[in-house]
Amino acid sequence: MSVVGLGVDAVELDRFRRVLARTPGVARRLFTEDERAYGTRFRDPTGRLAARFAAKEAAMKALGVGLGAFGFHEVEVVRAPSGQPILRVVGAAAELARRRGVGGWRVSLTHTDRVAQAVVVAVSEGQEGSEAPAGGEARS
């Protein structure tokens, strides 16, 4: 396994919370139905949603592209039964990853009361159960 790309992104929670409150449709544009549903399980979903947004941005950086290269719904953060975050990558994002030689992903999410952060590593070969292949979700 070798690293194809690395992306890191951080989101300021107060700012993200204001954007979500000011623009009602933004959550629908940024997150899949499952991501939004996951957020509603918590009294304040801001940190968890912001970490998922950071992961989408970090995935773009890991692929060496910017906003507009693919839609936000084409990179989704799902949870393995263990709770481990996993990237599900589909559509144009999966095709771009395939062309870049990405065979799997590593993702780490964290948040405090002020900042959410994600680190995404695109790797050349997948390992079953620990990362998602470029066009799907890891099985565990």
Regions flagged by a language model, labelled:
Residues 1-140:
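Core catalytic alpha/beta fold that binds nucleotide/phospho-ligands
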